[in-house]
Amino acid sequence: MKIGIIKETKTPVDNRVALTPEQVATLNKQYPNHRIVVQSSDIRAFTDDEYREKGVEIVDNLSDCDILFGIKEANIESLIPNKHYVFFGHIAKMQAYNRHLLQAMIEKGITFSDYEYLVDDNKERVCAFGWWAGVVGVYYTLRGYGLRTKSYYLPKPDITFTLEKLLNNLSAISLPAVKILITGNGRVSHGAQYVLNYIKARQLSENEFLSTENVNSISYTVAKAESLVKKNNNETFDSLDFKNNPQNYHSDFGRWAKSTDILICAHFWTAKAPVYLTSEDLQDAKLRIRMIGDVTCDIMGSIHSTLRSSLTLIHTTIIIQLQKKKSRHSLV
């Protein structure tokens, strides 16, 4: 079998890659009956020469490969008919913005495997960006808040950024006394919590967060699904039922919207689940939220300020009150 690592073709560009030069070289040696080649790319985090130095073949054409691995959605024009592609497709939730990609793959006779739905024998996902998305998501959100308020400055991350550099940047500034809400308690949420704990943000209980008007230092809480929704007919919340039948629940986010300065969305959402912030909610003069870091980035999903994906890893929204009306601006 011949396996190809594709050049990332989505706009905006993504410099991540499925396998490093060392990993490709190891796999080629360990499985001599199979071969992995890498499509030439000038945007990848690893250069072509770094792969060549490990004895990996760099090619321009992948048409003789059996399986093609990428990271983000492949550009429709780059799709090779009758191949098996593996990447994060963002189509399983029937996302409207990728409908044309799905149609193109069907028309071209392509077999598609989505990393997001690969699980082990225990039904646990084997591949996820989660934790790192939460880490970077918090940084971008706090960076956006600083730009909005002009109270501090954080540099925009680039390819040279490491976790240590990110944490050092946050530790070097004086962060304001704001209340941060993290929704969800999965990998993304844990990454966000890691950063906030590192910078010694105070963790509040849900009751403390909702009952405390102002805080003396940067503070946060984590709201799980049972605190964000209520079951219709006032029935008891059931996590398995919510997962299988989210349409039987409605949003209880209003109380959080009145108590939160910065919202970091780290929850899982599907089209049948409740919307937490509608367009009408965003116009409400009682809305306290001034910054949204939507790490989930579901377009017009649970947060209706997310109109498109941004040039960064998350979609950041600032909400400005002008004569009791709200306008939304994306920061990149």
Give the ranges of each region predicted by the language model.
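An N-terminal-biased, well-structured beta-alpha scaffold segment characteristic
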Residues: 3-104
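Short, ordered loop/turn segments at secondary-structure junctions
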Residues: 9, 40-43, 73, 117-120, ...
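A structured beta-alpha segment of the ubiquitous adenosine-cofactor-binding alpha/beta core
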Residues: 50-64, 222-287
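Phosphate/diphosphate ligand-binding glycine-rich loop within oxidoreductases
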Residues: 67-149
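ADP-ribose/adenylate-binding Rossmann-like module
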Residues: 81-116, 262-322
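Adenosine-phosphate binding glycine-rich loop
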Residues: 111-168, 291, 296-332
